[in-house]
């Protein structure tokens, strides 16, 4: 839908006159989120010359013109007590956006950087400032596995947590255990205003430490260092926001990042469901059918899933950032429940019985 919105705005067409058909895609990983200039330019040129125009690029050209990863320059600070209690963090970010904005930029800082950089820790204050700059690089969109700048945010908070542990002479795992949000404190609101719905971080880290025999590894590390041998042990814990859906927090081109599902049940008992997402190998056909089958009681094999054609798909913002099941899948569940409730009312009327 972002392709349609951008093409409509630049070429001067109304959106209902534009159709996007997407065939099977071999993976996405964030690099296919932006609407790159070549897409729009090819269509504009087609109008100018009055002939079909095809946009083709080889692998080398794609690497030169596609979105790039990282290139965030982050200065991070952490304040805490001598006994290891984190009190505050401060982040200053200089972000390279390339020569043009990509479609997901409005969501990049608030949802990616600001939601993650405060970490999984219980403290009161966090200050964040981000400046975006234009350079002569390709569009600085949602690059390969960047997930709205989550990677950079995790790196920043975890590095300064390690530095804090080193400064006060405390084990990095023990410092994290001391500062984790407690299980009984959920739901919990972060210093930047994000609500964490649930979690058990202490149990998660403890399970990982037990699996690798963390205490034994530390002893081995100490013995090796006595011999002049180097052995590093790294720990990283983070809470990632996924689902890219709540419209109050996520936005692309002012469209908001919701998704929809349309389900029709035929007299034969078979159903067809249409979505605005597009499978890139995740298996939407199975997942969505399972959700609908669970809600309606229709066998999975009797449910047809359709994606990839904007002429038939309901309005939605597509597949990326681990969002298809939380958004479109949730929409499928809600739509199926409405169908189920309607069917119960009709059946109750025809059979002259209670809906229950």
Predicted segments, located by residue:
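Alpha-helical support elements that line or immediately flank enzyme active sites
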Residues: 1-49, 106-118, 145-179, 203, ...
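Glycine-rich loop/linker segments at domain edges
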Residues: 71-159, 250-258, 326
């Amino acid at each position: 839908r972002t392709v349609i919105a951008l093409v409509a705005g630049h070429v001067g067409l109304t959106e209902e006159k534009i159709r996007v058909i997407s065939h099977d895609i071999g993976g996405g990983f964030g690099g296919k989120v932006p609407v790159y200039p070549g897409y729009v330019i090819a269509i504009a040129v087609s109008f100018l010359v009055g002939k079909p125009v095809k946009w083709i690029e080889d692998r080398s050209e794609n690497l030169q013109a596609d979105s790039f990863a990282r290139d965030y320059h982050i200065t991070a600070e952490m304040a805490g007590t001598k006994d290891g209690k984190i009190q505050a963090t401060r982040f200053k970010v200089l972000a390279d956006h390339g020569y043009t904005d990509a479609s997901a930029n409005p969501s990049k800082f608030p949802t990616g950087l600001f939601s993650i950089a405060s970490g999984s820790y219980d403290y009161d204050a966090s200050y964040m400032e981000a400046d975006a700059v234009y350079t002569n690089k390709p569009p600085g969109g949602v690059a390969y596995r960047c997930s709205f700048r989550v990677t950079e945010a995790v790196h920043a908070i975890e590095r300064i947590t390690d530095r804090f542990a080193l400064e006060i002479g405390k084990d990095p795992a023990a410092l994290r255990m001391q500062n984790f949000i407690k299980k009984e404190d959920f739901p919990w609101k972060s210093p930047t205003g994000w609500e964490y719905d649930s979690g058990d971080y202490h149990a998660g880290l403890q399970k990982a430490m037990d699996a690798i025999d963390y205490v034994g590894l530390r002893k081995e590390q100490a013995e090796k260092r006595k011999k002049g041998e180097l052995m590093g042990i790294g720990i990283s814990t983070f809470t990632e926001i996924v689902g890219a859906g709540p419209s109050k927090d996520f936005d692309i081109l002012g469209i908001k990042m919701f998704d929809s599902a349309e389900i029709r049940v035929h007299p034969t008992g078979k159903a067809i469901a249409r979505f605005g997402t597009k499978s890139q190998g995740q298996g939407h056909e199975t997942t969505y059918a399972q959700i609908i089958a669970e809600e309606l009681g229709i066998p999975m094999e009797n449910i047809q899933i359709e994606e990839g054609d904007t002429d038939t798909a309901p309005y939605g913002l597509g597949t990326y950032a681990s969002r298809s099941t939380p958004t479109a899948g949730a929409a499928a569940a809600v739509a199926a429940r409405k169908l189920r409730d309607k069917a119960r009312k009709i059946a109750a009327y025809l059979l002259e019985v209670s809906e229950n």
